[in-house]
Structure formats: structure tokens, C-alpha cells
């Protein structure tokens, strides 16, 4: 995936990178079931990239600091040996940044399909 434009969010207007955009997209797709492992699997399945779980968690922490996502700790589950999961959801700033990124990407991609097929 090309990283065409950087988007800014939050009070410090920090840039939103390509992987941050992918993480935000995964959170939206996963709705209430967005936690580190499901986010990792979603991105891997859709991009064909192999990811380290640490990269996902580092990005989630950064997105939380930027005010794009919020997290909460779920209830312990038997499948996790009584451990809890940390879930994530978009905050309004994250939704705005993702909408802007999506809009710019689709605008930039408009009309490229035919031309890309013609390239050798």
C-alpha cells in the first residue's frame, strides 16, 4: 500500500502514518472485537504482510497518545487462562483522521485501475 499523504490529529498535530491508518481500519472492521491479536490477523490477511505483535501494540499505544483510540480491559476469559484482553475503539479524532485518509486515497486512486493494467 502506498503512503501518499500524512494526516494530522490531536492537539499536537502529529502525523498519522500508513501503518497507523491500517490499524485504524482494522479497528473499524473488527467493531467491538478489536484487540491486538485480531488487529494483527486482520492486517496480515488483507495486506499479505507478516507482522510482529509488538509492532501492533506499539502503534496502538501511539494512537492512544494521539487521541485516536481508547482502550478498555475486558473480562477474564477461560480460553485465555483467566487473563483479560485489552480492547480498542476509535475516538472521534481517529474517525476524522481515517475519513480524511480514506477520502484522499480514493481521490488519488480514481482512474488508476485502467492505467495500472496498461503498465508493463
What are these regions (language model features)?
Residues 15, 61, 78-80:
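Short secondary-structure boundary/capping segments
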Residues 1-14:
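Short, intrinsically disordered or compositionally biased N-terminal tails of bacterial proteins
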Residues 56-63:
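Basic amphipathic alpha-helical segments that dock to polyanions
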Residues 66-81, 89:
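Beta-hairpin "wing" of winged helix-turn-helix
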Residues 24, 87-89:
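Short aromatic/hydrophobic contact patches that present stacked aromatics
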Residues 13-55:
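N-terminal helix-turn-helix DNA-binding core of bacterial DNA-binding proteins
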Amino acid at each position: 500500500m502506498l503512503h501518499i499523504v500524512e494526516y494530522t490529529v490531536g492537539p499536537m498535530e502529529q502525523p498519522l502514518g500508513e501503518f497507523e491508518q491500517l490499524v485504524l481500519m482494522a479497528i473499524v472492521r473488527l467493531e467491538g472485537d478489536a484487540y491486538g491479536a485480531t488487529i494483527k490477523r486482520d492486517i496480515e490477511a488483507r495486506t499479505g504482510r507478516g507482522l510482529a505483535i509488538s509492532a501492533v501494540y506499539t502503534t496502538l499505544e501511539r494512537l492512544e497518545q494521539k487521541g485516536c483510540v481508547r482502550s478498555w480491559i475486558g473480562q477474564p476469559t477461560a480460553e485465555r487462562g483467566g487473563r483479560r484482553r485489552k480492547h480498542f475503539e476509535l475516538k472521534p479524532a481517529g474517525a476524522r483522521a481515517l475519513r480524511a485518509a480514506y477520502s484522499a486515497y480514493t481521490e488519488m486512486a480514481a482512474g488508476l485501475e485502467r492505467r495500472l493494467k496498461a503498465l508493463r
